[in-house]
């Protein structure tokens, strides 16, 4: 029998609960939450953070109600194995047998992602990143990309640090759509500064002559920054799979190899929805110099700046399909389940 599928949902809260006060915008949903969940939502200073907190709470409950057929108001949570830092886990009602349901949630820049399964002996982790949300270029422009990566030296191995700073195995795409391979870039892959004018020779195709192209080093740094966030999301997803935090003492022993950034999708414009980009599933996981064979890692691009990384350990063979869900259609119907 085929192993149970893994569910992966993505909820976009950017256009939900408009205004600047979550208590007013989402008051009708507050009775659906526990006191702890409600406190987590309402203590957020910015409504964008409150939206994600509310979306996360609703998504977890909907997934459990759908997967186990339990009533919404009977769902309870606790953190395991550590009551403070552990992962939120479903606690079955007293008259229910222990459940094997497992899930993990991540949110960033308005999007909330959930991964879950009812398969026994399966561990999950998920992380979502947004490349252009933070003010990364302030440090990069002042000190260079090398110095910016060095901020995270406690999280990555020496090999990963070097790889992020000086490798662009996929090359770079210029503003006119021209793609330069890593071979054509040559030692420009070592460039870590913005605002430089670079030149390279593009190999002619189909009998066409070679041609010289000039481009800004901003494109190289942009590509490296996007790839850094791939490393970050993969590491975060793996750490969450283990139930530990990014303070885990073995972080630098965990290495990802064969890492490349998935090609982006397109951002939502006017009446169109944002689209999915490429999914990459051939990353290698290494720990203390040995290949980790029992954990599957994938990363999926969404719109131009988002990427969702998932980690799965267990008897799950198929690729994880990330599904965008709608609040009214896919989540709220489970609130009335009894």
Write out the residue ranges for each language-model feature.
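Core catalytic alpha/beta fold that binds nucleotide/phospho-ligands
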Residues: 1-338
